[in-house]
Amino acid sequence: MNIKSLMALILQLVCLPAIANNSQETVEKEYQIYWGICSNTSLMQSYPQKARKACNKAIEVDPNNPDISNPYLLKSLITIMFTDELKKGQSKTIFESTYKDLTKVIDNSDSVGQKSQASSYRLFTELIFKKKYKKYLGSNLCSDLERGLNHKMGRDLTQILMATYKNLKKECA
């Protein structure tokens, strides 16, 4: 091995960990910036598409972030609560994307509260929009009902849905 190759190897061994560490810091900073925009409640109400786009960017920037369920959940809530895209039936793709995002939260979150909230909103989308989009992925009604009632974060919406759709409880009994 010649001296230039040896020097290059030493330089790589010394510098690469610093470069990798710096890039991870950059990723974390970018994630926090996009997460801040995504979770801004006044922006959600005034410019829901912009807030949802920021949620997508947070997911894109750092898909392995331990808190990745947060942008998926907020992205879904923004679509359901602050846009009329699902009501107008503008796009089956938006419904499917929202449903899949809520499913990711349910499947991947460690938080019982987040699972409960995501389940109640998935139940909501399935019940409210089933005529427009049919059933999307089999029947998650009963498991969503159970999870929705399991924690205070999803309980209120789930109870409202049970009162509105009286057969729901019978269907899952």
Indicate where each model-derived feature is located.
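Short solvent-exposed coil/turn linkers within tandem alpha-helical repeat scaffolds
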Residues: 61-68, 105-118, 150-162
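Short coil/turn linker motifs that delimit alpha-helical repeat modules in TPR/alpha-solenoid proteins
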Residues: 26, 44-47, 64-66, 94, ...
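Terminal, low-structured helical/coil segments at or just beyond the last alpha-helical repeat
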Residues: 136-173
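Classical Sec-dependent N-terminal signal peptides that target proteins to the secretory pathway
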Residues: 1-23
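Amphipathic alpha-helical repeat scaffolds of TPR domains
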Residues: 25-40, 65-86, 112-132, 163-166
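Helix-turn-helix repeat elements of alpha-solenoid scaffolds
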Residues: 42-56, 90-103, 137-140
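Alpha-helical junction/boundary sensor with strong preference for TPR arrays
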Residues: 41, 55, 61-62, 102, ...
